[in-house]
Amino acid sequence: GYGHYGHRLVFDDEGYLWITSGDRQKFTPAQDMQSNLGKVLRLNDDGSVPSDNPFVDHFADSPLVDRIGVYGEVWSLGHRNPLGIAQDSQGSLWVIEMGPRHGDELNLIRKGGNYGYPEVSDGDHYDRRPIPDHITRPDFEAPKISWVPAISPSHLSFVEGTQFEAWRGNALAAGLGAKVI
C-alpha cells in the first residue's frame, strides 16, 4: 500500500522507545498480529523487546516473534494512521491519528488495547460506505475524542513549563486539514 506510514517516535520517562506504525492503506494489517503495521510498538532503548510487553512469549532464537508468529514489540493494535504520539505529565501515552473520511481520533493508549480499525471507526470509507461506529463494538477501545469533520492531525504534544501556565498539561494537536492547533 501507499501512504499511512505513521512512524512517529518518542522516548518516555522510563526510557522506552514508542513507535507508531500506519496500516499502509491496507485493511488487514491493523488487526493482524503477525504484522507490526497499524500498531503502537514499545522497545527498550537498545532495540530489544521489554519482557512485560503484552504479547511477549519469545523463542530464544527469534527475539521479536513468539511461537505463533506474534510480534512481541506490539503494545496496541487497530490503528489506521497514527501521526502524533506524546506522554502527558501523569505518564500516560496518547496517540492522535487520521481516521478514514472524518473520524480522526485521540486515543489514550492502553497495554494490549485494540482500537478497532478497520472493524470500527467514527468515520466512513472515502467511497462513503459506512464503517460501524465504536459504540457498536464495546470490545474495542473507543477514542477519547473523534473529529467530524476531520482535522487531519499531524502532531501531538502536551504543554509543559510556565510560559503558557493556563494551558499547562493540555494537549495541543496540529491539524493539517483544519490548519489550526
Label the predicted regions:
Residues G1-V10:
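Asp-box/WD-like beta-propeller blade repeats and closely related beta-sheet repeat scaffolds
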Residues D12, T20, I96:
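Alpha/beta-hydrolase-fold catalytic nucleophile elbow
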